[in-house]
Amino acid sequence: MTTEHEVRRLDRVIIRFAGDSGDGMQLTGDRFTAQTASFGNDLSTLPNFPAEIRAPAGTLPGVSSFQLHFADHDILTPGDAPNVLVAMNPAALKANIGDVPRGGEIIVNTDEFAKRAMAKVGYATSPLEDGSLDGYRVHPVPLTTLTIEALKGFGLARKEAERSKNMFALGLLSWMYHRPTEGTEAFLRRKFAKKPQIAAANVAAFRAGWNFGETTEDFAVSYEVAPATRAFPTGTYRNISGNLALAYGLIAAGRQAGLPLFLGSYPITPASDILHELSRHKNFGVRTFQAEDEIAGIGAALGAAFGGSLAVTTTSGPGVALKSETVGLAVSLELPLLVVDIQRGGPSTGLPTKTEQADLLQAMYGRNGEAPVPIVAPKTPADCFDAALEAARIALTYRTPVMLLSDGYLANGSEPWRIPDLEELPDLRVQFASGPNHTLDDGTEVFWPYKRDPRTLARPWAVPGTPGLEHRIG
C-alpha cells in the first residue's frame, strides 16, 4: 500500500553518495545529476575517488564519493557540508561522517555492517547501535537484501544482483527529491543494450528503490527543490564537465580561426578526458596524436603550430615540468601554442585523482631564461569553454604560447552550460604571411620573419612551403 508522506520545499540540498570504488558511486551520482539537470535546477558536482589503484574493499583508502549541490537559485560551488549522506558500508560512513552537520540525514546500507567490516575501519562497536549517530536522522536500509529480493525473478547470481544496489539507492533518492526517472531508465537500457537481462535488472532495482521510498514508513518526508528558472538566461542548456567544456572550446576555437586543430598529448590524469573527447571529432578537422611521453607530445604540437595549425598539448603538473624546455622554445620562436595544465595534488608525480591549485608559480616562472607566458584560468566547469577560446585568441593574436590552468575539481565537476549561438563566438581568423614584407635600400623585396605588426607586435606567421618565404626562426 502507499503511505502518505509530507512534502517539504527546500531552496537547496547537498547530497553525497559514498561507498567502495566498486559500488558504482560515480555512476549513481552522475545519473542523479543528469536527472537534476533535466529538472531545471542549478547544480554543481564534486566527484572524489581514491588515488590508490583499487584499494582493498571496505577500507578507508578505497572510499569513492560523489557530491551534488542543487538549488532553485544560482549556486557556485559543490558545497562543503552534505545535508544527506548515502553510506554503502562502514568505511564510507567513517570517512564522511565528519562532514555531515548535526541534524543531517544518513542513509546506511545495514547489510554491510558486519563485525569484520566494522573492525576493518576501527569501529569497536556498531555506530548504528552505540549512540554515536544520535544527533543525526539515520535511515537504516538493507539495500543489498532489498535489491536481491527485487531481482529474484531475473535468474542472476547473487553477486550479479548485488551490483545493482547502487541503482536501488538511486531510485530511493530519486523518490525522496521528486527527480524525473525516464532519463535514467533510458540510459540503463542504452548502456546495457548488449545485455538485456542486466539492463532489465538495473531498471527493476531502480524502480524498486523508488517504490520502497513510496511505501515504507521510515521515510515520512520527501522534498521538492523547484527549478532555478531565474538563474538561467533564455537558451538551450546541457550539463557539462570542465574537461568536456574545454574540449568543445578548443574545437570551437579551431573552427572560428579557420585552422585545423592538433592535439599532441601524453595521457595523464586528470587531463586524459580531453584527448579522449577530441579524438572523436575528426569531422571538425581535429587531429590527435598520443605520444610516447610528455616531451614528444609538446614537440609534435609545436611542429603543428609551425605548420599552421591551432596546436594544443594537455598535461598535469608533472608534465608541465617536462614540457618546460619546449615551452621556452615556443616563446623564442613566437609560435601560438596552448599548454593545458589540469592541476592535481602534490609534488613530483603527485596524487592523480586529488586536486590542488599549486602550479601557478610553475606556469609563470618554470622556464630558464626570460620566457614569459600569458596564463588563463577558468572559474567554473562551464567557464572552461570560454577560457579555451580566450587562450586561443591570445595565442593566435600575439604569436605566443599560452598556459591554461584548470584543476581536477573543475575537470571532473559539472554544472549547467548554455550552448552559445555561433554568432556569439569570437572571430579568431588569422592572416598567414603570403609574400615579402620588407624592401631593402636597393629595392629588393624580402621576407623578415620577425618584423613586427605595429598593433599587436606579433611577428608574421609563415607556413612552410609558401613560395619565397623560406626563413629560419629561433
Over which residues does each language-model region extend?
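Acidic, Ser/Thr-rich peripheral helices and adjacent loops at domain boundaries
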Residues: 117-133, 356-364, 421-438
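Active-site cofactor/cluster-binding pocket
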Residues: 1-257
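Glycine-rich, charge-decorated loop segments at or immediately adjacent to ligand/cofactor-binding or catalytic sites
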Residues: 116-122, 150, 324, 347-353, ...
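Conserved anion/nucleotide-ligand pocket segment
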Residues: 159-166, 170-178, 382-385, 393-407
